[in-house]
Curated annotation (Swiss-Prot):
Stored SUPFAM superfamilies: HlyD-like secretion proteins
Gene3D superfamilies: 2.40.30.170
Entry protein name: Hemolysin secretion protein D, plasmid
Cytoplasmic side: 1-59
Family: Belongs to the membrane fusion protein (MFP) (TC 8.A.1) family.
Cellular-component GO terms for this entry: plasma membrane
Length: 478
């Protein structure tokens, strides 16, 4: 190893010595300087050797090298935009609404036309819900009858308290304004009939009570009579017993008197028993008399409660039917413009949830609904700038729109042509394109191409990325 190093050192010293000697005589080795015309008289091979080289190729080489250096510096320092391209269309913002019927209906009248502007509250379309008008009239009639029944029971309830039939007077309410005279007469007749029936029942119970009271008086009179008779017969029996003790009369007379006394006592017991029975019957008659009024009152109050409940249900049903009819008259919620009118025949039938038209507020804005491919969605964020090019108007002549990413839907959508794509909403600043002094309005449904700026990258990285990708993939191969 030491020998090898010594040899290498001597080799370097040798070459150093040769270079030094050559450097000392370098000027002697230069060709003598000659004029241009002197070179022309030299032999051809010497002329070619002695003639200086032209500076033009050298300048071109310097220029090319400088250009390459400048291009390299610009490629390192220069930045280009990274753009994700997505196809889409112009749509209205979320405030545009579809008008749909709530149920199967018949088109009664078409008020508006396609593209017409209407103000808030203006009628757009009149429909007739199947059976809604008939249901409303039926419910109104049933509700009026229920209120008349309620009035009838209220009058009968007051008649029980006053024990006389009050005068029929309908309350001063709007729903009683159209009640016919025949209906009033029928109601009056029915009230009188019910009141008379109750009075007759009460009168019959009162007669029965009076009858029992009369029987009670008769029995009391007989009891009084036999009480007196029994005392007399008892006194006579005592007298006869005293005379028998003195042997003034026969024993047969005493036995006969005793028999009369026993008969009087037995009759007294019979009538007292009848009195107890009559007292019980009188008590029952009083209860029946009171029960007639109580039952009639309970019946009236129960009917009144049922009628009141029925009025509540019918009122809700009427409100529901009126709401159905009101929903059949479609009005503009705000000042809007009518678009996509799909109803053109009066008398035609529309079904539930069928789109009749689309209304767009006059101050509504357009936005872009674009489909972003799967490879680009990871680089798109809300707030990124975008350039919108409308296919109907070439951007080289009409320009383009400027917008920002408003919303990103991360649920993939299956597209037959593009595969899995993602829906991105881009808000735009203007609803028209400007060319010269003329504004071209845009409408929903126009096809557009959205170029979303996702970032910046250097030119050199852009140029080297295919090479880097190829090298990276090639190094992975077996």
């Amino acid at each position: 190893m030491k020998t090898w190093l010594m040899g290498f050192s001597e080799f370097l010293l040798r070459y150093k010595l040769v270079w030094s000697e050559t450097w000392k005589i370098r000027k002697q080795l230069d060709t003598p300087v000659r004029e241009k015309d002197e070179n022309e008289f030299l032999p051809a091979h010497l002329e070619l050797i002695e003639t200086p080289v032209s500076r033009r190729p050298r300048l071109v080489a310097y220029f090319i090298m400088g250009f390459l250096v400048i291009a390299f510096i610009l490629s390192v320092l220069g930045q280009v935009e990274i753009v994700a391209t997505a196809n889409g269309k112009l749509t209205h913002s979320g405030r545009s609404k579809e008008i749909k019927p709530i149920e199967n209906s018949i088109v009664k009248e078409i008020i508006v036309k396609e593209g017409e502007s209407v103000r808030k509250g203006d009628v757009l379309l009149k429909l007739t819900a199947l059976g809604a008008e008939a249901d409303t009239l039926k419910t109104q009639s049933s509700l009026l009858q229920a209120r008349l029944e309620q009035t009838r029971y209220q009058i009968l309830s007051r008649s029980i308290e006053l024990n006389k039939l009050p005068e029929l007077k309908l309350p001063d309410e709007p729903y009683f304004q159209n009640v016919s005279e025949e209906e009033v007469l029928r109601l009056t007749s029915l009230i009188k009939e019910q009141f008379s029936t109750w009075q007759n029942q009460k009168y019959q119970k009162e007669l029965n009570l009076d009858k029992k009271r009369a029987e009670r008086l008769t029995v009391l009179a007989r009891i009084n009579r036999y009480e007196n008779l029994s005392r007399v017969e008892k006194s006579r029996l005592d007298d006869f017993s005293s005379l028998l003790h003195k042997q003034a009369i026969a024993k047969h007379a005493v036995l006969e008197q005793e028999n009369k006394y026993v008969e009087a006592v037995n009759e007294l017991r019979v009538y007292k028993s009848q009195l107890e029975q009559i007292e019980s019957e009188i008590l029952s008659a009083k209860e029946e008399y009171q029960l007639v009024t109580q039952l009639f009152k309970n019946e009236i109050l129960d009917k009144l409660r049922q009628t009141t409940d029925n009025i509540g249900l019918l009122t809700l049903e009427l409100a529901k039917n009126e709401e159905r009819q009101q929903a059949s008259v479609i009005r503009a919620p705000v000042s809007v413009k009518v678009q996509q009118l799909k109803v053109h025949t009066e008398g035609g039938v529309v079904t539930t949830a069928e789109t009749l038209m689309v209304i767009v507020p006059e101050d509504d804005t357009l936005e872009v609904t674009a489909l972003v491919q799967n490879k680009d969605i990871g680089f798109i964020n809300v707030g990124q700038n975008a350039i919108i090019k409308v296919e109907a108007f070439p951007y080289t002549r009409y320009g383009y729109l400027v917008g920002k990413v408003k919303n990103i839907n991360l649920d993939a959508i299956e597209d037959q042509r593009l595969g899995l794509v993602f829906n991105v909403i881009i808000s735009i600043e203007e609803n028209c394109l400007s060319t010269g002094n003329k504004n071209i309005p845009l409408s929903s449904g126009m096809a557009v191409t959205a170029e979303i700026k996702t970032g910046m990258r250097s030119v050199i990285s852009y140029l080297l990325s295919p090479l880097e990708e190829s090298v990276t993939e090639s190094l992975r191969e077996r």
